[in-house]
Amino acid sequence: MEGIEESFAPLSPKSPFARRNGRSLRIQRLVDCQHFHYSSVELGPVRVAIIAINADENATERIKMRVESESNSWLVERSREDWAVFDRQLHRCVFERRHSRLDELFPLIHLETAKFEEVLVKYTERLSELTGSIITCYPVLKFLEIDSRGGHFEPAEETSINVPAIAAAVVTKDFEPTESSQLRLRVGDIVSITEMSTASPSEQTFWKAKLTISNQKIVDPQNARLGFEIGYFPRDCVMLIDDKRLPNPLNNEQKASTRNARRYMTTMFRNRRREPIFGLELTDLYMRTGKKVPVIVEKCCASIEDQGIVTGIYRQCGIQSNIQRLRAKFDSGAEPDLHEFGQRDIYSVSSLLKQYFRQLPNPLFTYQAYPKLIEAFEKEDSLSEKVESLRFSLETMPEAHYRTAKFLMEHLTRLCKSKSLTDMTSKNLAIVWSPNLFRPPPTLNGADTHLLSGLNVHTAICDFFIENSESLFVNDIDEEQSKCTSVENSFTTISKSATMSDMRSESESKWPRFFRGKSVEGFWKFNRKQQTSTGELCGSPTSEVKWRSRSTRSHSTDAAFQSSRTDSFIQLMHTGMDQIREGMRIFRARARSMRPTSRPPPSPRTRRARFSNGSSNNVQKLNESDIQHEIPLATTEPSITPEPKNTVDPHQIMTRTISVNDSDDQSFEENGLREMRERKVMFKAATQEHVATFHERSSPVEEWSSDSRESLHLEMSRYDNVSPSGTITRNQREPITNLSPAAQMLFFESSRASHLFSA
């Protein structure tokens, strides 16, 4: 094995971090170009010069260059592919290509040797002018074999030492050994951990590691082990390195042909859980999402401009529970409805935005640009000269930081225009925002000497940025803009997005976004909406009847009918079985009660009448043939009466006499079924008027219903003047005494008469 090798074998009990969540911890090799940034570096001028391009014993082309730093020089050999990866890493983490003005090497790696050498000569000359303490990226420094103090280091993978390691770490605090078995550490050194021992909380924990990268000089060049010692040190002196490697485009092209669908789907489902955005570098978030301005910044600023013009915005704090709830939603990849949330607690939205910028590892105005900004601001120049120097310093920041700062400062400038309503001037906003946007770079000894002295300067420069945002942030380059670079007396187009969003595949987020889409409820509503629109456009008689029945419902009925079907089943899936049963029971009851065909329950009086009539079953029905037989006699021979002496004109006053024998009811109950007794209708003259009244019902629906025939179920509040067949309207009801005898009897059909007179 060579260097720090990977091993999946079970580790000793002294390595508690060997397994995480039941899965083996992958041991990273330092040669795999793990990506991390030093918290601070001490680099002077670094000179890089191309010596020659030669072929080695394997006929592989190697580019030899000389690196000079801290009055030392050494030779480094790299390939064309190494230079292309270095160029992309340099412009991903350190420089913007618009500021560095360096040619992109990846499209030029297939040039002839002489032409490519000329390109590299120009490249290294420009690179030597840009190097300095701004370079904190470990892969960039490793390419030049420079440590954090500007000295030369030889990676352990290129030496004869071979010690299995389980992790790599960077030293964050100096440590002086007190025993011979301990290591002497300095800030910026790299160690390869070989053993992670545990101890009680009251004791100090020591780890064992190999000093991989150090500023110590190798005394004996023949023995490379002298510069790489193994020993113990306190665990709080180092920080483990997470693997954030830049994907190699050459390897991606080779692997694209061999990738199958099963592996792609497995990777997709495995990576469905999104990483949080709080505490994530702006450049890393941009590489992941492709957005120059984070979504949380756009959403919060839009919500505050719409609903946050209130007193003390950004000064008053919101409710902590609401802030944590919003943060959890953004970290999970969701986008909460800030418009609805802002109506209740807009101060929580403003506090969330400040918390996001406060937790950035590298502040919005980066550590690298901090000295230049302070120096340009403190110069006693005119306003135009100060704006010009600050603009130049701002353009050196990474593009994600520059665009986000431009967006935020323009938002604060618009907010200052409503200072009469918010009581927040540019000075007040600067006092609130400056601690979240400006932080002095950390020092090697960990002493923040500029923290207190820089507070006033931070407030002043933030106030200046808010008042002059239109003049400072003007160099805005479009996403699709490209620029031409001269290469060997010709012009080649280099796309600006070649080092940014185009490096990631656009197809990686399509399928996961589909599976992480809206809920089943929303999908069901969308499908149902399409079916409804299709049914309305259809010209069939069935769809026409359905459309008419929907339009006859009132707005309140429609709203209640629709709300009964919007209960989400997904919410019930997270509860117990008892709650699911109760929810289904309530859901069915609500749906049943909201149906258009449902009728109100009958009154207690109607129920008692139905029960008494149905249980005794002793109602004698009127024979339709008898009614038809008696009525013609009354109409054709009105003078024939049982008492001819007292003849009275039948048109004067008419009554109905219905003879019902009480003894028949008792005999009917005793003997069971019996032939219905014939009911006679007679007309006689009388001095006293007897008027038969209708059987009134308490329910308006029951008033128009009958047991023998179904009627249309209509809203009685809208159709009071509609007379269904076999009924009369309320407004046209007249006493029976005003009708002729024939009209009186023809009005009541047999089934209708039996129902009315049986009550």
From Swiss-Prot:
Keywords noted in UniProt: GTPase activation, SH3 domain
Domain spans labelled Rho-GAP: 280-473
MF terms in GO: GTPase activator activity
InterPro entries: PX-Rho_GAP, Rho_GTPase_activation_prot, RhoGAP_dom, SH3-like_dom_sf, SH3_domain
Entry annotated with the keyword Ribonucleoprotein: no
Organs and tissues of expression: Expressed in coelomocytes, excretory cells, uterine-seam cells and GLR cells.
SH3 domain segment(s): 164-243
Site (Arginine finger): R315
Biased composition (Polar residues): 612-622
Pfam families reported for this sequence: RhoGAP (PF00620)
Region (Disordered): 591-624
SMART domains: RhoGAP, SH3
UniProt record, GO biological process: positive regulation of GTPase activity; signal transduction
Biological function: Functions as a GTPase-activating protein (GAP) for ced-10/rac-1 and CDC42.
PANTHER family tied to this protein: CDC42 GTPASE-ACTIVATING PROTEIN, GTPASE-ACTIVATING PROTEIN CDGAPR
Protein name: GTPase-activating protein rrc-1
Gene that produces this protein: rrc-1
